[in-house]
């Protein structure tokens, strides 16, 4: 109910904040459906959380992932056949309600979630409730900060530019957020396992696994950023047309944020696994810093300024403040900076060397012109293979990367 109420209030705020919203007919009906759909997802949040905590995340992904695929397929079909956006939103509503009943049925019929009376004192109950309240409050602040960072850019683009820029910017962000969704699924899937691993390990073993995770995700961020740089404009052109592409300079700025969103994942994994959510004000600070610098720079240089503002908040909070807080809790405050640098410095140097090599050879790669989807797939194959080989070859010189690869091979084979 609280989410629904906040959404309605924000809707009225947007009406007065963004002038071009008035040009869209039935805009408040559309907004109401979006808010209702979002609030309904909280109806089964406790069920999906219980399954995830019980290391049944694969069940959650099957329901949510399968539901999403089916919903999107029906939405595309309705848009093509009826051109009715209200029906598009109604499908989302029905899908969320169906998922709620599926989750509820699983929880009610799973013996692991049956309430069994246990001998626990009132003091212990009070302690558990207080700890749970604190962790929920801390998590709430983290989520609010994330929403501020991810969504203020759209509002600022609408305010300082216009809705046509929102369409162009949103098209790129839709592509980039595929990476975020995939990474989030991976984080949720392995967090419980990492938490179990950390319980029985000493500092040296924890340090070793932290180095491996950071090295691998920096390598992955390098690979993703390279492919996005050489392919995203071709994809947008093939998808919705050449008039919707952005300049290479703006694309590079956006990819800096994509790079940061991937290399931050080890920190998120260890934070979720250890439960160190005490840095409750960092996410809010991140949102405020992002809003301030993005609005200030947008006034002078437009869209690049908005993206640079997000980069500034990402660097200050995501890459500096949050990791230092987490590793201070894990290894001691005075060891935090030293540990953090030992995790990221060497792989970042490898990454920048690879970026430099591709930058000076970019003309040869960009020269591959794309005029249809077959050309795009061909270019995708070539760029992906070349970048994968180079990234793997360079990072394989790092012992932590080799250790992680061997660990994966042992699990697979």
PLM region descriptions:
Residues 7-15, 75, 79, 103, ...:
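Structural signal for membrane-spanning alpha-helices in multi-pass inner-membrane proteins
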Residues 33-52, 63-75, 88-104, 142, ...:
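Short runs within selected transmembrane alpha-helices of multi-pass transporters and secretion channels
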Residues 85-90, 127-135, 157-177, 205-208, ...:
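Interfacial/gating helices of multi-pass transporter permease domains
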């Amino acid at each position: 109910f609280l989410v629904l109420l906040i959404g309605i209030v924000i809707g009225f705020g947007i009406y007065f904040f963004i002038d071009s919203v008035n040009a869209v007919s039935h805009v408040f009906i559309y907004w109401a459906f979006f808010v209702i759909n979002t609030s309904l997802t909280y109806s089964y949040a406790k069920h999906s959380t219980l399954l995830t905590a019980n290391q049944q995340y694969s069940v959650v992904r099957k329901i949510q992932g399968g539901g999403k695929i089916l919903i999107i397929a029906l939405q595309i079909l309705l848009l093509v056949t009826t051109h009715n956006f209200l029906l598009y939103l109604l499908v989302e509503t029905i899908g969320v309600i169906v998922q709620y009943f599926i989750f509820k049925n699983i929880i009610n019929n799973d013996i692991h979630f049956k309430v069994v009376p246990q001998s626990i004192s009132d003091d212990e109950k009070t302690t558990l409730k207080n700890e749970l309240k604190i962790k929920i409050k801390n998590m709430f602040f983290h989520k609010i900060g994330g929403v501020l960072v991810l969504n203020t850019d759209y509002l600022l683009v609408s305010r300082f530019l216009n809705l046509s820029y929102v369409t162009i910017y949103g098209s790129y962000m839709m592509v980039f957020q595929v990476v975020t969704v995939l990474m989030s699924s991976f984080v949720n899937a392995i967090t419980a396992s990492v938490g179990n691993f950390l319980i029985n390990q000493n500092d040296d073993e924890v340090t070793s696994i932290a180095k491996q995770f950071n090295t691998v995700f920096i390598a992955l961020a390098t690979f993703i950023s390279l492919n996005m740089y050489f392919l995203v404009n071709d994809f947008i052109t093939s998808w919705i047309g050449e008039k919707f592409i952005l300049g290479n300079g703006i694309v590079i700025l956006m990819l800096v944020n994509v790079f940061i969103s991937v290399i931050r994942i080890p920190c998120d994994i260890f934070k979720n696994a250890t439960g160190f959510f005490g840095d409750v004000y960092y996410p809010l600070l991140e949102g405020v810093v992002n809003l301030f610098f993005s609005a200030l720079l947008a006034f002078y240089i437009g869209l690049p300024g908005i993206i640079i503002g997000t980069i500034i908040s990402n660097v200050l909070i995501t890459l500096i403040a949050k990791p230092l807080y987490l590793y201070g809790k894990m290894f001691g405050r005075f060891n935090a900076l030293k540990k953090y640098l030992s995790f990221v410095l060497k792989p970042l140097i490898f990454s920048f060397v690879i970026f430099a090599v591709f930058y000076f050879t970019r003309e040869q790669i960009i020269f591959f012109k794309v005029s249809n989807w077959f050309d795009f797939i061909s270019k995708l194959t070539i760029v992906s293979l070349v970048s994968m080989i180079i990234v793997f070859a360079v990072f394989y010189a790092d012992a932590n990367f080799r250790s992680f690869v061997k660990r994966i091979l042992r699990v697979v084979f």
